[in-house]
Amino acid sequence: MAGSGRDRDPLVVGRVVGDVLDAFVRSTNLKVTYGSKTVSNGCELKPSMVTHQPRVEVGGNDMRTFYTLVMVDPDAPSPSDPNLREYLHWLVTDIPGTTAASFGQEVMCYESPRPTMGIHRLVFVLFQQLGRQTVYAPGWRQNFNTKDFAELYNLGSPVAAVYFNCQREAGSGGRRVYP
């Protein structure tokens, strides 16, 4: 029997579903762009390319529908020992449908990824809100839990998600190990 479509879903293959999210059905468009580079699942972006917050465009068909955007790193501080999973890089709420994250309410400002060891997945998750709501900034960025956050604020399942891979650039300091 051939594998189901879910087997080839890049969010499943990249273990975003499981490590960060439960399986969900995408129902809204989410476009994340750093400069001229649009994020696609599993693409590689260098830390120098992601120092400034990206442009995030949200689909939907009604400006009276609001969305919450979460950006997390489930591989902090390293993929082999992710004891800070998930590290919260950005949190924006009340984004009107058909607009961009810049029209929302920034709860936690963007912090650029600076991975030191291994390849890190940086995950953008979009939730549809039931209406405008007050979201409180977490006390810290490490050990954030996207699923618990969604439950706390009654956000339900995600409506979109996309992730990219990021690793420390060669020549950016640190110890060198030669074979």
From Swiss-Prot:
Induction: Expressed with a circadian rhythm showing a peak at dawn and then decreasing to reach the lowest levels early in the night in SD conditions. CDD domains: PEBP_euk. It is found in: Cytoplasm; Nucleus. It comes from the Eukaryota. One of its GO terms (biological process) is flower development. Its main location: cytoplasm. Gene3D superfamilies: PEBP-like. The keyword Zinc does not apply. One of its GO terms (molecular function) is phosphatidylethanolamine binding. Expressed in the inner region of the SAM, stem and leaf blade vascular tissues (at protein level). Probable mobile flower-promoting signal (florigen) that moves from the leaf to the shoot apical meristem (SAM) and induces flowering. Promotes the transition from vegetative growth to flowering downstream of HD1 and EHD1 under short day (SD) conditions. Acts upstream of MADS14 and MADS15. This is Protein HEADING DATE 3A.
